[in-house]
Regions:
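Alpha/beta-hydrolase active-site loop
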Residues: 67-87
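A short loop-to-beta-strand scaffold at the N-terminal edge of the catalytic core in hydrolase folds
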Residues: 1-10
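Alpha/beta-hydrolase fold nucleophile elbow
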Residues: 90-101
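Active-site glycine-rich loops that stabilize anionic/oxyanionic intermediates
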Residues: 16, 21-27
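Alpha/beta-hydrolase-fold enzymes
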Residues: 109-181
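Glycine-rich nucleophile elbow surrounding the catalytic serine of serine-hydrolase chemistry
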Residues: 99-109
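Conserved alpha/beta-hydrolase
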Residues: 29-31, 36-62
Length: 181
């Protein structure tokens, strides 16, 4: 099982449901601790696991952002494994699946195959198509042939993220554009 956090409601409070979170790009489960606490204090069992290539799944610098040999399909399977585990541990509670940013893309893919396993879905910060998406996919496939599937191209990063990073440049925080007040 991937590195994960489960936060239960305090004391004798009876759980009213499960909220499973799927985090975004360049994030990890510990960034959500305050969110888990907020909802667990309201009576929810809150759960989040690090996506491959993120958080405690990263053992070497080459692991950052690497989704494994199965890529997207493997991430969908990881979500299903964790959801199945949560439903087995807490069988009589409704499960709400929340995906943020890249996690929103993953949960949208997940419900195409497994909608019967969840009771509600929340999609937030979902990225939209941009004019470079298809070109980016082609460039990434070509680059994989020459430099392997773990190579992180600064060019591709600038092409895909540059427009979002520009307004936050003065903050001096890498990936500040991912989430702001």
């Amino acid at each position: 099982m991937r590195p994960a956090t489960i936060m239960l409601p305090p004391g004798d409070m009876e759980a009213i449901g499960i909220i499973e979170f799927v985090h975004g790009m360049c994030e990890h489960r510990n960034r959500y601790n305050h969110v888990l606490k907020y909802f667990s204090d309201k009576g929810f069992i809150c759960a989040i696991a690090d996506i491959k290539g993120h958080g405690e799944n990263v053992l070497t610098p080459d692991d950052y952002g690497y989704f494994g040999e199965d890529g997207y399909k493997g991430l969908i399977q990881d979500i299903d494994d964790y959801t199945t585990f949560l439903k087995r541990e807490y069988p009589n509670l409704p499960l709400i699946l929340i995906g943020h940013s890249m996690g929103s893309l993953l949960v949208r893919g997940y419900i195409k195959k497994h909608s019967e396993k969840i009771d509600a879905l929340v999609v937030c910060g979902s990225p939209s198509e941009n004019s470079f998406t298809e070109l980016g996919k082609i460039l990434i496939r070509v680059m994989e042939v020459f430099v392997g599937n773990r190579y992180r191209s600064p060019f591709i990063s600038r092409m895909l993220n540059g427009p979002f990073e520009k307004p936050f440049k003065k903050d001096g925080i890498k990936n500040a554009w991912l989430c702001s007040d």
